[in-house]
Amino acid sequence: MIELRNLSQRFPGPGGWVEALHNVNLTIPQGEVFGIIGRSGAGKSTLVRTINLLTRPTEGNVVVGGRDLTLLSAGALREARREIGMIFQHFNLLSSRTVFDNVALPLELAGASRADIEAAVLPLLDLVGLSAQKDRYPSQISGGQKQRVGIARALASQPKVLLSDEATSALDPETTRSILDLLKRINRELGLTIVLITHQMEVIKQVCDRVAVLDAGRVVEEGRVIDVFLQPHHEVTRALIGDVIAQELPPALKARVAERLKTGRGHLLRLAFTGSGVDQPILSETIRRYELDFNILHGQIDEIQGQAFGSLAVLAGGEPGKVGQALAFLREQGVVVEELSYVE
């Protein structure tokens, strides 16, 4: 388990102290894939580097596996870091060493024998799909393969935690998906806790169990990925989700809807469904029961961690009392109802 307690980080700047992190509190259970997302400058990389104390926090505590790293001696901290692997956006491979020897480097530095190194490295290369490339040099393999070398190297010391700092941001979409699939498989097969930093909500959607949204050094939202997608509360979260799933109507369509409502009454709603609600006739049942007009303006169905997720933008019309009853009925069926605007 990872616990970040009242974590703050300040750096000196030209105009005074800059607060990169402010009173961050997070608990990440063992075996979870936990995402941290935010815009550029939100403090994501600073936060992940406090977990292994590459950046020592100004205030607060970092507890990994029951040990408070901020209280350890230099020697004890070096030993604790062996249980925390890390991969980066840039692969940081040694060009003069083969794939095998790059993965073996941490074990060589730890004084392992050649036999122990081979016994550890060969299964790792098989795990990341690089057994056939073990004798090649970094210049002879692709970017995605280089990141796989970085992952295998990070796993060489058999860590319990893997930190990923924008590890896929320099890769094309197809390669990104393959790396994320690999990380999920490593999490599942090795029981590894993974903390993943990204600015892409698509990455969070594909691989993470839970997510924290960071803005200006503060955690502004946290929860299960499916819950955050269903009902985002903070404007930063809504903007990030909007990069993956359209949350609002295009301006031209919104203007036409407003024109249509000028002479009447109406509700512009966002309805979010998950699980079995996606393929149930809830909307048609609502229309029949409450004698409403529902005009579907926009919709899509996606999948988050194997769970179906649907989102609709609808224009609802009818008697005000019945509209209210209909919205209550939808909520009883597990539909998340958000009123985007009300025009009278």
Curated annotation (Swiss-Prot):
Binding-site residues for ATP, renumbered to this chain: G38, R39, S40, G41, A42, G43, K44, S45
Keyword Signal attached: no
Domain ABC transporter: 2-241
GO cellular component, one term: plasma membrane
Listed PROSITE patterns: ABC_TRANSPORTER_1 (PS00211), ABC_TRANSPORTER_2 (PS50893), METN (PS51264)
Gene3D superfamilies: 3.30.70.260, P-loop containing nucleotide triphosphate hydrolases (3.40.50.300)
UniProt keyword list: Amino-acid transport, ATP-binding, Cell inner membrane, Cell membrane, Membrane, Nucleotide-binding, Translocase, Transport
CDD domains: ABC_MetN_methionine_transporter
Gene Ontology MF terms in the entry: ABC-type D-methionine transporter activity; ATP binding; ATP hydrolysis activity
Subcellular location(s) of the protein: Cell inner membrane
Top enzyme category: translocase
Enzyme Commission number(s): 7.4.2.11
Location, primary (coarse class): membrane
Matching InterPro entries: AAA+_ATPase (IPR003593), ABC_transporter-like_ATP-bd (IPR003439), ABC_transporter-like_CS (IPR017871), ACT-like_dom_sf (IPR045865), MetN_ABC (IPR041701), MetN_ABC_transporter-like (IPR050086), NIL_domain (IPR018449), P-loop_NTPase (IPR027417)
Membrane topology field: Peripheral membrane protein
Similarity remark: Belongs to the ABC transporter superfamily. Methionine importer (TC 3.A.1.24) family.
Function in brief: Part of the ABC transporter complex MetNIQ involved in methionine import. Responsible for energy coupling to the transport system.
Complexes and interactors: The complex is composed of two ATP-binding proteins (MetN), two transmembrane proteins (MetI) and a solute-binding protein (MetQ).
Protein name: Methionine import ATP-binding protein MetN 1
Native organism: Burkholderia cenocepacia (strain HI2424)
Gene symbol of the encoding locus: metN1
